[in-house]
Amino acid sequence: MKILICGLPGSGKTWLAKRLADDIENCAWYNADVIRTASNDWDFSAEGRARQANRMTTFADFEVSNGRSVICDFVAPTEHSRISFKPDYLIWLDTIKEGRVVKEKKEELEAAKDLPFEVESLEISEAFKDTTKMFETPNNANKVIKSFLSDEEIKNLALEIQNV
């Protein structure tokens, strides 16, 4: 089972993915920022976004081919990026209207070494404004989430996904 959690920066994708992965048996989890860091690729141009989507798809397909479920959390701002990923289950976090960097994400990035930008610049980054502008509402989400879920709601979502 290939699960995509998408939404604007700061919408809670990583928060949900981490908790959901704990409640789905034999489930891997890939976070877009971790993959970008490992790849040293912070290019948010159309080409950079396509490379990132391809990387996420490659990791996810590897896990599925080895009999595991996988959760990938990344913005996936366009319908094309979501279709290319080919999720079995798509969760859209519709929790904010404009992308932003939350305090925890800033602290995580500040701990990273050799980033090609200043972390403080992310709060006003054009990349996030561009992401907000280009984000297309998912047409085929299996689940639309508009607020943070309780632990019980996450467990129920995990059961729902496993029964698909």
Give names to the regions the model predicted.
Residues 2:
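Walker A (P-loop) ATP-phosphate-binding motif of ABC ATPase nucleotide-binding domains
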Residues 17-58:
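Conserved substrate/cofactor phosphate-moiety recognition/catalytic segment
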Residues 8:
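P-loop (Walker A) phosphate-binding loop of NTP-binding proteins
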Residues 5:
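Hydrophobic anchor at the beta1->P-loop junction of P-loop NTPases
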Residues 14:
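Walker A/P-loop
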Residues 84, 93-164:
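Small-molecule kinase domains that catalyze NTP-dependent phosphoryl transfer to phosphate-bearing small molecules
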Residues 11:
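ATP-binding Walker
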Residues 47-98:
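Glycine-rich phosphate-binding loop used to anchor ATP phosphates in small-molecule kinases
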